[in-house]
Amino acid sequence: MRVADFSFDLPDELIARYPMAQRNASRLLTLDGNSGALGDKQFTELLEMINPGDLMVFNNTRVIPARMFGQKASGGKLEILVERMLDDKRILAHVRSSKSPKVDSLIHLDGGYQMKMVARHDTLFELELLSELTILEVLEAVGHMPLPPYIDRPDEDADKERYQTVYNQNPGAVAAPTAGLHFDDAMLDALKAKGVNIAFVTLHVGAGTFQPVRVDNVLEHKMHSEWANVPQDVVDLIAQTKAAGKRVVAVGTTSVRSLESAARASLGELKAFSGDTDIFIYPGYQFQVVDAMVTNFHLPESTLIMLVSAFAGFDHVMAAYQHAITQKYRFFSYGDAMFVTKKAH
């Protein structure tokens, strides 16, 4: 299986650089994984497709303002993008500068804060904050929302709200779980009123989600790792849902990866899970937990389009993407959504 198989040509004007005025005003492309049938809908019509007793699982991670600017002691400018918080004072980060900072060197951040370069781990730098404050407090003071590179504009105040789900709770992501951006409080209330059950997992999306796949053969790709948590109450809800013959609907690929990681860690039997996951889902994968998913449109040759292809069938997904391009759907983080049901194996 070649990475190039997952390529498609996307006109630049279909990349959404701003969100819709209202969260749920996006369009929704439905894809039946078994038949390949497509439907052009509005996102609010998702309400009609989720049945009473179904369980919707959301990722409640909170995006941190993970991009900081500063300079080295030598005066050279640099940009820091947090990959993950190690504790209240230390981060693993991507550093962009003309020359990499050396071990023990100081970094002067905007706002007068200082960090020390502690160690290098492959392409990532371990940095320690020299302050009474916590990393989160400093990020809230001087950090910028880490908009994906393809949005191709500086972050604005509005992004602090809109590049964040309404149900976010646990800070730690450096990219939004974007399928969740379409849900507002009214829609969540309408789902509950219909008898749909709602549950939350956490997966702190890392910047690795934007790293291109750099191999030709899909099987050779090494997946980045991210921290996920699937609590016992969610496991119990899933068991009840399955026992009643209802569906588990994951909102976003991060929710899919969290649930499938928990099943993988206990050899197919779903148990509570907390820890790092590097699960890589591509065609041929047998899904253990998820029956349907809400997801945005993903980048060509990305691990995310591979995951959706594993779920609904490669040919069906690539045909759906061509349809979306023809119908001028909006792509990527601030774009439109899909509702996809699983292809039977």
From Swiss-Prot:
GO terms for biological process: queuosine biosynthetic process; tRNA wobble guanine modification. It comes from Shewanella putrefaciens (strain CN-32 / ATCC BAA-453). One of its GO terms (cellular component) is cytoplasm. Monomer. InterPro entries: QueA, QueA_dom1, QueA_dom2, QueA_sf. Transfers and isomerizes the ribose moiety from AdoMet to the 7-aminomethyl group of 7-deazaguanine (preQ1-tRNA) to give epoxyqueuosine (oQ-tRNA). Belongs to the QueA family. It is an enzyme of class 2 (transferase). Its EC number is 2.4.99.17. It is found in: Cytoplasm. This is S-adenosylmethionine:tRNA ribosyltransferase-isomerase. Its main location: cytoplasm. GO terms for molecular function: S-adenosylmethionine:tRNA ribosyltransferase-isomerase activity. Keywords: Cytoplasm, Queuosine biosynthesis, S-adenosyl-L-methionine, Transferase. It catalyses: 7-aminomethyl-7-carbaguanosine(34) in tRNA + S-adenosyl-L-methionine = epoxyqueuosine(34) in tRNA + adenine + L-methionine + 2 H(+). Pathway: tRNA modification; tRNA-queuosine biosynthesis. Signal peptide: none annotated.
